[in-house]
């Protein structure tokens, strides 16, 4: 099997998990805080199909891409400032925590085989990368929403 194809193949679960969890946490947080729009759009789910756009997913395999953004409305939050911050910050925090969990698992299980080690490496990498990417102060990243509040 071609090495670069294998790298792409083993990276796909990392992309799927990181992006799906990120958008799911945003949708769930917004819904819990009173905004039912993400729920009405079917985005309060861990089904990756609901969180990806086909072109954005393909771009992620090669350079940088995007998931399907969860649309939220602060109009329905009880405390708009605090709740907007929570909706912006929590997905990134969860990605960072997941990345650290997968990094620990990688350190523990990498000697069990190349494939499991590589898979855990990419699960850690994409979660941490998405967290770092979202703290960049560039629209439409999460950091810009935090700075706007």
What are the functions of these language-model segments?
Residues 1-149:
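Hydrophobic transmembrane alpha-helices and their immediate loop junctions
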